[in-house]
């Protein structure tokens, strides 16, 4: 069973993924994969070096510097994102094949832009992760994501309502960690997925 997580930024998708791990799930964390690609993928690093001055430091992409180019969101950025998404897709396909070969029962995909990039096509179920706007704003503030960057991120994502409609389950992360865990447990129990 492959479950994917979707939702807005700062809603707690990574925490939900960690909860699924408590039930034996193996998580594909696309953010971690991207961070690794920024260190070792020569084509991505080369493209960044040519198109985003100052972004490559000591042979690796500096994510802080790179984030400044995101605000421009021009054709160079779109091409860069396409390169990154293609590399992540290769890693995802490898991950799924490897885990299926050893008969892993539960995989969880924690992938930003899951629906926008069609990564959801690899999944059996989609879980929409939601937090109320006050909690989400607090989390974004803790991550130093300002309103301008949030608006830009929102512009390239499907609307929250579209994500909700495409989902099989909804998890609310606004209340407490215990409540989130209980919702994950309910999903696992309903699907008879205890591994």
Curated annotation (Swiss-Prot):
Keyword vocabulary terms for this entry: ATP-binding, Coenzyme A biosynthesis, Cytoplasm, Kinase, Nucleotide-binding, Transferase
Example of a GO cellular component annotation carried by this entry: cytoplasm
Name of the featured protein: Dephospho-CoA kinase
PANTHER family: BIFUNCTIONAL COENZYME A SYNTHASE-RELATED, DEPHOSPHO-COA KINASE-RELATED
Organism per entry: Wolbachia pipientis wMel
GO molecular function, one term: ATP binding
The protein's enzyme class: transferase
Reactions mediated catalytically: 3'-dephospho-CoA + ATP = ADP + CoA + H(+)
Family: Belongs to the CoaE family.
Chief localisation class: cytoplasm
A Gene Ontology BP annotation from the UniProt entry: coenzyme A biosynthetic process
Binding site residues for ATP: 10-15
PROSITE patterns xrefs: DPCK (PS51219)
SUPFAM superfamilies for the chain: P-loop containing nucleoside triphosphate hydrolases
Enzyme Commission number(s): 2.7.1.24
Keyword Zinc belongs to the record: no
Domain DPCK intervals: 2-195
Function in brief: Catalyzes the phosphorylation of the 3'-hydroxyl group of dephosphocoenzyme A to form coenzyme A.
HAMAP family, sorted: Dephospho_CoA_kinase
NCBIfam families for the chain: dephospho-CoA kinase (TIGR00152)
Signal peptide: none
Name of one Pfam family that matches: CoaE
Superkingdom, natural source: Bacteria
Recorded metabolic or biological pathway in which this protein acts: Cofactor biosynthesis; coenzyme A biosynthesis; CoA from (R)-pantothenate: step 5/5
Compartment(s): Cytoplasm
């Amino acid at each position: 069973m492959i479950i994917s997580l979707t939702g807005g930024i700062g809603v707690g998708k990574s925490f939900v993924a960690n909860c699924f791990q408590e039930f034996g799930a193996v998580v594909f964390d696309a953010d971690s994969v991207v961070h690794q690609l920024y260190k070792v993928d020569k084509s991505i690093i080369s493209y960044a070096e040519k198109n985003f001055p100052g972004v490559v430091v000591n042979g690796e992409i500096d994510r802080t510097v790179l984030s400044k180019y995101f605000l421009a969101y021009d054709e160079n950025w779109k091409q860069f994102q396409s390169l990154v998404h293609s590399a992540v897709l290769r890693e995802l396909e490898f991950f799924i094949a490897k885990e299926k070969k050893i008969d892993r029962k539960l995989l969880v995909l924690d992938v930003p832009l899951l629906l926008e990039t069609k990564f959801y096509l690899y999944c059996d179920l989609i879980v929409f992760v939601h937090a109320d706007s006050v909690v989400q704003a607090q989390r974004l503030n803790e991550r130093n994501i300002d309103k301008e960057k949030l608006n830009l991120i929102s512009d390239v994502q499907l609307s929250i309502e579209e994500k909700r409609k495409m989902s099989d389950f909804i998890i609310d992360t606004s209340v407490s960690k215990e409540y989130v865990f209980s919702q994950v447990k309910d999903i696992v129990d309903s699907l008879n997925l205890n591994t």
